[in-house]
Amino acid sequence: MSPTGFFLLTVLLVLVTEAASRGPREKFSQSAEDPYSENMNLKILASGRGSSSTFGAFSRSENSRSNFKSKSPSSITREKVNEESRSEMSSTSSHFGLKMRRSHGGGEMNPFETKVKTRITRK
């Protein structure tokens, strides 16, 4: 058995034993805490036995992003955030895709805040 096959089999075994060890009450309480858990259906489609392409195909429910609504109140005001030029970023932060940003509030300059830029693509 190849090391990749052994690793995938071990991960599958851990996932199955964790799912079997949960009781029905714990599953219910988890779904009550996370309202989006029922919309996030992640399925593994096995395309070949023992091959590395076993975990290659995933499908996600179509309505998971379309049903998303922000729970934050509309009265919260957000400060404008200006993105600094790329030349002012350090080489280590640009290596990891980090952007340095500065917020202006009330005429005073706040310390720089590092935020990770993530992209969400829709299918």
UniProtKB/Swiss-Prot annotation:
Where is there biased composition of kind Basic and acidic residues? 77-87
Kindly state which keywords UniProt assigns to this record, in alphabetical order.
Secreted, Signal
Q: Does the keyword rRNA processing apply?
A: no
Q: Which GO terms describe its cellular component?
A: extracellular space
Query: Which locations, inside or outside the cell, does it occupy?
Result: Secreted, Extracellular space
Where does the record place Low complexity bias?
A: 64-75
Tissue pattern of expression reads: Testis.
Q: Where is this region: Disordered?
A: 50-123
Can the keyword Secreted be found in this entry's annotation? yes
Q: Any signal peptide, and if so, which residues?
A: 1-21
Induction conditions: By testosterone.
A Pfam family (short name) is Svs_4_5_6
Instruction: Provide the family line.
Output: Belongs to the SVP2/SVP5/SVP6 family.
Instruction: Indicate what this protein is called per its UniProt record.
Output: Seminal vesicle secretory protein 5
* Gene name, Swiss-Prot/TrEMBL: Svs5
